[in-house]
Curated annotation (Swiss-Prot):
This is Uridine kinase. Belongs to the uridine kinase family. It is an enzyme of class 2 (transferase). Keywords: ATP-binding, Cytoplasm, Kinase, Nucleotide-binding, Transferase. It comes from Bacillus velezensis (strain DSM 23117 / BGSC 10A6 / LMG 26770 / FZB42). The gene is udk. GO terms for biological process: CTP salvage; UMP salvage. Pathway: Pyrimidine metabolism; CTP biosynthesis via salvage pathway; CTP from cytidine: step 1/3; Pyrimidine metabolism; UMP biosynthesis via salvage pathway; UMP from uridine: step 1/1.
Amino acid sequence: MGKSPVVIGIAGGSGSGKTSVTRSIYEQFKGHSILMIQQDLYYKDQSHLPFEERLNTNYDHPLAFDNDYLIEHIQELLNYRPIEKPIYDYKLHTRSEETIPVEPKDVIILEGILVLEDKRLRDLMDMKLYVDTDADLRIIRRIMRDINERGRSIDSVIEQYVSVVRPMHNQFVEPTKRYADIIIPEGGQNHVAIDLMVTKIQTILEQNAIL
C-alpha cells in the first residue's frame, strides 16, 4: 500500500462529458489500483416519501445529495477500508435496498455535478477538475441519456431542463468552476487535456509512492 489514496474530483454540468473524462482517465490507469465513485448514487434516500413527492425532487440542488454519507465512504476508502456503495433507482426515484461492495484502491475518482460545491469534499481531493461544455451540447446529451437510460419522455426532460436544470446549473454548478485546479473544455473530446491530466495524476501518484 502507498502512503494514502489519491482522490481526483471531476465536476461539471449535466451532459458536460464528466463521465467520458472519468472513463478516459480510468482506462489510462486500468492496470493500477483505481476505482470510480459517482455522486449521483448518493442522492438522499426517499423511500419514506410517496412516489408523487419523489417526482418533484430537485435533483440538481446541493440539498438533494447525502454528502454526509458520501464523505463517510470516502474517508473509509482513504483509510483502506471497504464500503457498501449505494445504488440509486432512477425509475423509482429513491435509493435501492441493494448495495455494491467496493474494496479500497490507491486512486479514487469522484465524479458528479456538485462534487466541488461542498468544501468538505474539496478538502479530501488531491486534484479538482471541471469539465466545461457548451449548454446546447449538454442538453442534447441529457435528453438522449434520460430517454435511453432512465425511461423518461422527451417532454419531461425538456421541461425539467428549463425549469430546474438550467437555473440550478447557473446558480450552483457553474460557480464551482472557480475551485477547479484545471478546467477541461469540450469534455471527453479534449484528448490533449485528458493526456495532460493523466500526466499530472501520475506525478501525484509517484509523489505518494503509489506507482
